[in-house]
């Protein structure tokens, strides 16, 4: 007898907190039973009940080539056959470090780690060690991993210290983090004018992907660069999501912004656990064993993950790769916007490279507050209706979606046809029409 998603979820909750190993997978935001998957191929994956889905999550971004790309699978098999871990230097980790520095002009040196959280917390420690300062600026709605210093929410005013957004984070730790509004140039200028000499770094997603998808304005990023330079603070671009997902030179290439440090993850591991942080040589040389800022990891530079990452990075350098990816993503977002308008549904969408955001409101949001004004009940209805028809979007109104190189006109057309039927069957139409 075939096991069901519900049966697995009930068993999982006995042994795994909430039944999942990362909270969003529990479907708490949208309700219902999480889907348990057992295999994937290209733009599709299949659950334990044998149902297939067009996948617009892509393991939350890493699978830019799609599921089980044959060249990536082959690279992993070869690497694993030679040994799954050495805890020592390898030629392959040097190769990927050289490649990352060649592809991203802002990287003069790079350190490999195993997760985006690890990269983010290491970059923060490095910035503090380099500058001798403690204060960090982050922006409301941006997510940089579950490091204590970054699980912080805004206080009651622009210059108030942050408060923990998770139990277990000491108030003293959160107090070193200032939380400002995304795309708020005036707020950043005011904060630097009063506290600039105390700020070690500003960390920001150039395209935010954890409050759905919000693009930074050019003025916002240029202001951050100017103020960090003026006050001796480091600008850290969190490109865990956008890195090699929105273009070959990442979001910093699209905006023409050169950060002091960059955080990378997801795509560079090809679907296996790997991330990195890197940047200016004088800053990176503060890391042990050269300097006094300590960072280490047993599985850092894991040879199997490096093999998957190298093959993925080679594939995305093929001429025209990002043109095709962007075209498919825009076809999806523009098509969804058109069918929603056809049925008078308050809806919009936008895309950057292979990332996209869907919003049940009339215009794309520019801040966390505007995201919160979107019609989340309408999103939840849409999510479950699409899921039932075999289209898998992120199970949260606050997460970006992803298109892979394996998505073709066939998958996009199927998705739009399903959305057309669902929008036509009676979504909530005008509640948020003025937003």
UniProtKB/Swiss-Prot annotation:
GO molecular function list: glutamate-1-semialdehyde 2,1-aminomutase activity; pyridoxal phosphate binding; transaminase activity
Keyword annotations of the record: Cytoplasm, Isomerase, Porphyrin biosynthesis, Pyridoxal phosphate
Positions bearing N6-(pyridoxal phosphate)lysine: 266
> What subcellular locations does the record give?
Cytoplasm
Enzyme class, UniProt record, top EC level: isomerase
Pfam families of this UniProt entry? Aminotran_3 (PF00202)
Q: Provide the E.C. number(s) assigned to this enzyme.
A: 5.4.3.8
Q: One GO cellular component from the entry?
A: cytoplasm
Q: Does the keyword ATP-binding apply?
A: no
PROSITE patterns linked: AA_TRANSFER_CLASS_3
Concerning InterPro entries, the annotation shows: 4pyrrol_synth_GluAld_NH2Trfase, Aminotrans_3, Aminotrans_3_PPA_site, PyrdxlP-dep_Trfase, PyrdxlP-dep_Trfase_major, PyrdxlP-dep_Trfase_small
What are the required cofactors? pyridoxal 5'-phosphate
Instruction: Give GO BP annotations, semicolon-separated.
Output: protoporphyrinogen IX biosynthetic process
Keyword Isomerase included in the entry's annotation: yes
**What does the record give as its pathway?**
Porphyrin-containing compound metabolism; protoporphyrin-IX biosynthesis; 5-aminolevulinate from L-glutamyl-tRNA(Glu): step 2/2
Q: How does it assemble?
A: Homodimer.
The record, for NCBIfam families, names: hemL (TIGR00713), PRK00062.1 (NF000818)
Q: Which HAMAP family match?
A: HemL_aminotrans_3
Protein family: Belongs to the class-III pyridoxal-phosphate-dependent aminotransferase family. HemL subfamily.
Q: What is this protein called?
A: Glutamate-1-semialdehyde 2,1-aminomutase
Upper classification of the source organism reads: Bacteria, Pseudomonadati, Pseudomonadota, Betaproteobacteria, Nitrosomonadales
Q: Which gene encodes it?
A: hemL
